[in-house]
Structure formats: structure tokens, C-alpha cells
């Protein structure tokens, strides 16, 4: 990370605030904080932003893309610190200045491909951070697969870390939630890596049914209690039914990730639970697993936060596309779904908006042919990309 001057002033820019856009404005930041901004071309000597957007750095609550860098091919394991650095570079150049790295707390006998190696990757993130190798600000999101026998033990090993900002309650047992249609889940596994045979899938599904019956209820209570003990926000995952909504309310969930039906989304929203949907869902025009489209939820006023999920560049693309799909959403409110609202959801009050005194986590974005290009990225005032 390098900085060539104590103060940076950008002029001739479109400044995206929380409630409006300054169509021709300027912004100054120093000592890692936003100092001033206003209308007009800017003070003499301002760096010309050539009419580009200046936005808060994006805030990502749910991405498992680190796994693609650590295991770039089936059974090929990269150096974990090198994988973190590569992944971090992709995040930064996608405009993401704060990320909750989503680590799967999930160990399963006979299913090496779903072992997220959460502890190993968490330690690699720490090592990269301590060596000043990271451009984005990294926190952890522990994705707890509730039916797994060792999930409570593994979560306890990680939950005391100061960088844990979110825990989610997952249950990928076949025939429910995201994959109510078992056939779609079978197709998903057949398409992964070398694929799985029907016999292998039968064995996998039988084991997961048994795990859910034996462990899910007890593990759910213990994981929820663990999160509340450590004052870590909780997220539900793939809520589908009224029962799922009732459970989320009971467990004092603050964010609902990827509800699969509009009925569930309505119930969650009425309970004051923030709705998080996938940015790829917006960009592609629908869910890859055939569930509710994020744009349909947005039209109903049921979309609060976007997440890049599995492709970092989708976060910015989706935010800029939302106003094209939903008349009630303007650019400022669309940008809130990837900045201020996710920041508030996990208690990061010092960032996520352009306001005096907030962190100078900023991005400069050029848009051509409806494709956004991140020209520059600053984290706490330092140019990192």
C-alpha cells in the first residue's frame, strides 16, 4: 500500500451519497477520513475524475470465493496465504474494501469436497493481514452447517477471534430450503468437478438425512447460544417456509440470506430481519437453483443487502443494474445495498457512506456500455488499487 500525499482531492466527479447523487462534485480526504465534499468542480489542483462515480467502498457479507483460490481444481490445494492474497486482489479490484470471508464450518466423513478447512483459512487470513499483504479489510463469517456432528466443536475453536463478525445457520440436507427439488441437487453435484455417480449421491444423501435427524436440533440450540454469548450477529440461510421464518425470529436472527420464496421474504421483512440476496441473481436475471429472483423481491420492497456470493465483480454490477429493473430504486438507494446497509448489519458504523469523519474507503468507477470498471480504490485514504 502506498500514498504519495497527506490529502487527496478528487474533482469533476459524480458523488454517490446515501440519499442522492451530486452530479458534479468533489471530495477531499486526509488521515484516513473523509474531510469535505461538495458541489462544483472542486478546489484548484483537484485530481480530475472525468465525470466518474465516486462511491463508498463496497461491503461484502457473504462470499466463499476464497475456496476457489485455495482449491482451484478438484484435489489441487494452493498455498493458503498465496490463495488469500490472490483472492484479496480480486476483491479490491472489484471495489470491495471490506469483506466478511465466508468460511464453511463443515466437516463430513466421506465428503472431502465440502470441508471448508475454516481454521486453516482463518489462520492464513491472519498471517496475510499481519504481513500487510491485504488491500481490503477482512473479517470472518462462520457458515455453520448445523447437522454436521462436529460443527459446535469447530465453531467454538473460531468464535473467540476478534475478526468474527457474523455467523450463519445453514442446513443443506437434501429436499428442503435451496434444494427442495432433490433432482436439482443431484444435477448440481454431478456438475461439480469430476461429478458424482447416482450410487455415490444416494450414500451422501442417506448420510445427511441421518445427520440431520441425530444432530440438527441440539446443534442449532448450541450454535445460536454461542453466537449470542459472543454478541455476534446471526444470519439464517435459504429460508423457505413459515416454520423457517418462525425459527429465525426465535433465534433473533438479524439477516436472512437468500430466502427462496416470496412468502418467507415477506415474513422475515415484517419481523424486521434484513433480506440479503445474491448479486449474481440480479445480473443473471434469476436464481441459478430456480428459486425467487432478487429483482422480484426488490420490486416488493423486500431487498436490503446484496452479496457477490461466488463472483466478486457481480456486487458492483448488480448495484448499478438495480435502478434499471426497479422504478422505485434510484442509484443512491441501490448503492446502499452494497455499502451502508451491510455495514450497519454487522456493526461497522465507521464506514459504508460518504460523510464527514467516516473512513475514506472509496472507489472510483467508470461505466462504459453498462459495464462498470473500477479505476481506483482507497482504503482509509491509501490507494490500494
Predicted ranges, named:
Residues 1-43:
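N-terminal metal-binding scaffold of metallo-dependent hydrolase/deaminase domains
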Residues 13, 32, 51, 95, ...:
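Glycine-centered positions in the ABC transporter ATPase nucleotide-binding domain
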Residues 49-121:
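Metal-associated gating/positioning segment near the N- to mid-region
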Residues 59-61, 99-101, 138-142, 165-171, ...:
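Hydrophobic faces of well-ordered beta-strands that scaffold small-molecule active sites
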Residues 106-239, 309:
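Metal-coordinating catalytic core of metallo-dependent amide/deamination hydrolases
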Residues 142-153, 239-243, 247, 255-257, ...:
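Active-site glycine- and acidic-residue-rich loops that bind
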Residues 161-165, 248-255, 270-276, 301-304:
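Glycine-enriched alpha-helix->loop->beta-strand junction motifs that scaffold or abut catalytic
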Residues 271-281, 285-366:
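His/Asp/Glu-enriched, well-ordered alpha-helical/loop segment
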